[in-house]
Amino acid sequence: MNNEMKRSFRIFILKILAVVFVLTMCYFLYAFVYRARTELPTKAVVTNRASAVYTLRGQMQMLSQKEAFSYFAFDGREKEKEYGTYVIPGLKNTRTLLTEKGATQAMCTSMTPQGLAVTEDYVMVSAYCSTQKHNSVIYVIDKETHNFIKEVILPGQPHVGGLAYDPDHKLLWYSSNINGIAQAVSVKMDTIEAYDYDESHLPVDSQQTVSLYGIVRDSFMTFYEGCLYVGCFEKYNESVIARYGIDAEGNLINTMDKELGMNFEMAVPLDYSTISEQVQGIAFYNDKLLISHSFGILPSRLVVYEQSDKRLYVNENSARTYRFPERLEQIVVEGDNLYVMFESCAYAYRVSSVNIVDLSLIHI
């Protein structure tokens, strides 16, 4: 090959690399930036009930490539309704409010699921608008029939990364914030059951709103043995779970302590536990603590720890680790069942996710 041919070949290779680079950048900008900031137009006037991407059969076929996860999710559940799984509603269209215009009705096509709670009668999923135009919501699903019942509109645009159910006082807690201060908000289950979007076109009323001392963000939460556990997501550093006390009425215990730098009442943790980075949810099961880890397009992990007085739940102390599809969010234990939820089915993440997963019920 003479010098001229070598030069032409190098130019050809450089052109191919340039095209590949441009196409890669276009894909990245579309999948990770554009879709997170835009919404699809819609003519719908109600919240959709069907799955956003897969039928149940399609979901099972896709997950069959993940043998361990598929086994946990579907094995032995043939006689259960929809193999024990629940569809996350509202990911195509959700009735909500246009935040800047108060009680103005609106449809959102960019809801992203985050929090998960299971009560005696319902499965509830929280979601926020990825374009930050609409109020956050909670989807209420009938636990027995698996049917979507209604959407409950929340005040403002909290990320609602965590839901927690207090079965003793029949209260649902959700994570929020104001002016950069982490908050926990409770809503009576009676209020949720009575809520009617068509009647009020207003956000649901809360029972208690409490600022949380000692935690930067309330990214996830759970309720266990009369206490509210709240954790903070950190991308690359260890973080904490804070345990807060509840009084006889089901309210978080507030205090005003100027020695702690407070100038208003806040809930102060009873104690802290140390956790590893990238935690999205926690759940207690007998003498074990289950922690979900995920970040971006990397595979998720479900890590099992033995509960310890040292309260040090970092990777090197784990008892067992399971590999899950990407974008695993909150987890909930009820009896011997583990409910897990993924945000990969949201409009903002569908193109950038290899494995798109709806809500699943996994048997421990």
PLM features per residue range, with description:
Residues 104-108, 152-156, 209-214, 270-275, ...:
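Surface loop/turn motifs at the tips and blade-to-blade linkers of beta-strand repeat domains
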Residues 187-199, 243-258, 306-312:
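Short loop/turn segments immediately following beta-strands, especially the blade-tip
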Residues 311-334:
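Conserved blade-ending motifs and adjacent loop-strand segments that build the rim/top face
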